[in-house]
Amino acid sequence: MEDFVRQCFNPMIVELAEKTMKEYGEDPKIETNKFAAICTHLEVCFMYSDFHFIDERGESIIVESGDPNALLKHRFEIIEGRDRAMAWTVVNSICNTTGVDKPKFLPDLYDYKENRFTEIGVTRREIHIYYLEKANKIKSEKTHIHIFSFTGEEMATKADYTLDEESRARIKTRLFTIRQEMASRGLWDSFRQSERGEETIEERFEITGTMRRLADQSLPPNFSSLENFRAYVDGFKPNGCIEGKLSQMSKEVNARIEPFLKTTPRPLRLPDGPPCSQRSKFLLMDALKLSIEDPSHEGEGIPLYDAIKCMKTFFGWREPNIIKPHEKGINPNYLMAWKQVLAELQDIENEDKIPKTKNMKKTSQLMWALGENMAPEKVDFEDCKDIDDLKQYHSDEPELRSLASWIQSEFNKACELTDSSWIELDEIGEDVAPIEHIASMRRNYFTAEVSHCRATEYIMKGVYINTALLNASCAAMDDFQLIPMISKCRTKEGRRKTNLYGFIIKGRSHLRNDTDVVNFVSMEFSLTDPRLEPHKWEKYCVLEIGEMLLRTAIGQVSRPMFLYVRTNGTSKIKMKWGMEMRRCLLQSLQQIESMIEAESSIKEKDMTKEFFENRSETWPIGESPKGVEEGSIGKVCRTLLAKSVFNSLYSSPQLEGFSAESRKLLLIVQALRDNLEPGTFDLEGLYGAIEECLINDPWVLLNASWFNSFLTHALR
């Protein structure tokens, strides 16, 4: 917990909390939960005060950034965090200048706008009970009380919340984040119970004598005995209070808080319709590579030279023909485009010196495939605003698609190991400062688990393609440049290998804005027969271009070689993120680290070595219709990496929406599993928000299917 506090909070807050504890003779290293609670309370007090000022007219305003010379006065005086002597000096000074009554206890803030002291509370318990305790302790109507909880609730004197909604939301979000971070490290239960005392020893003792009299004296008004008060608290149902608070906020709000039970949630409704189709920018499990080992040819490292060398390793080229047409496209154009690529590559070889780049001739088939002269003419709005029936371009609603089995197969394949290494040890990047031994050890273990993973191949392939396409888009804006799709790896024996997946031909690319689109035609080699899953290849025209001899257990067999051709498009911003796909390695490493941290905090020692080297232990990987799937730590690393990579490859507004909305339902279910007795209102509205993102995206549909499996097994 101490390490978490030092990582999670601003160093100034940590220092103040340490001083406060030492002032009261407490040790932050021993009373770690108290240390965390004090830091949290300090941060909430500072956030409460941040950005709130009083202008020259005495009006309260919010200024997040602006003129530092403006005549503004801070709305709140912060008392919390000062040493006791200084804090009382500030309180006395305020009382003398404003005439307000001096409080019995040190408050947290003074509000110059409302002319009152404010007591801020942060509780891990039931908010109403904590509020009663505060009010009973202060016994002053002059001090305003404002309580926040880690579950997003708040309570204030006379329902006067002082601050605007956004400022309060910022505080609630921060508290929720702290709770999530603690939970992910296995610290939350201990922290929560340290305040609640729900499982502490005193509850099992009979309270007698002086302590009993003191307990009876310190009850809130209208309670005759401790048992009486306990019975009220245990049977307390917050429904009416919450509804009352909501109705105070707005007359339009009419919410009934319903308890969320195991039987409450229903599965997400996945759409019906034709099966969803492949929409990634390049082939994944179906890709085929033409490779050269230990490349040492002239111009090695220049993409066009490498591509020609790879093409020469294959001798099974045949006259191409269409075997799966694209339903809406002019398929002969795709066929002629491939023939043009072959012819122009042959022309290059006949030249004395091979050029570093190749711009394709602007033939009719390429102009059609790249959408040349197809974009509607742009007209300035000023020139057409007087047109009576001017309206937005009408576009049809997207057609609903159902989940298809191929996307689960793609994901499974991405988690598998290949026989090549796709990243060097330092690919994740060295720390600038002298890196701790533990951190470097974790990185090395993680890299060893994922360096041969197919998802890592997709990362390097994505980085290469996006970098090459963005470079060409800027350097050769008007040209139809031929861009080889290349990756590099090392074999098991450590030999370097260069792979060619196919080619891209880039269209015109005058990209002024981040979202301006560049069209491209992709042509990718494959051994997958598209007729096996035609729905997956809806957007492609597939040609048969040759025969490949493959070594199998029964000897050499001949298999047809296919070329998957399609028109596609991307933008500057998408290419920028594609170039940064290595971030997926970092994201999944951080997720693994939080698992190690949780384990280490339980065992109270670093568990990195045991975590990676104890091969007998299995870990939960995910949910399937069969239940919770488990696997080795390596499998967990590769699964987390594959999820991160697929989030990048299949990023879309549907995924953004589904992730944000389904997370809310996930947190409610998690609260139920933690016995926190969650309540909800308008649950069907939340389901609606999730389900409107389930349209036709294969990755989103698969995640929704996984979510349903999770609901089934989580609530048994």
Swiss-Prot record:
Keyword Nuclease among UniProt keywords: yes
Residues binding Mn(2+) 2, per UniProt: E80, D108
Protein modification: Phosphorylated on serines and threonines by host kinases, including human casein kinase II.
Domain of life of the organism encoding this protein: Viruses
Record bears the keyword Protease: no
InterPro entries: INFV_PA, PA/PA-X, PA/PA-X_sf
Obligatory cofactor(s): Mn(2+)
Position of sequence motif Nuclear localization signal 2 (NLS2): 184-247
Motif Nuclear localization signal 1 (NLS1) positions after renumbering to this chain: 124-139
Keyword list, A-Z: Cap snatching, Endonuclease, Eukaryotic host gene expression shutoff by virus, Eukaryotic host transcription shutoff by virus, Host cytoplasm, Host gene expression shutoff by virus, Host nucleus, Host-virus interaction, Hydrolase, Inhibition of host RNA polymerase II by virus, Manganese, Metal-binding, Nuclease, Phosphoprotein
Similarity comment: family membership: Belongs to the influenza viruses PA family.
Protein name: Polymerase acidic protein
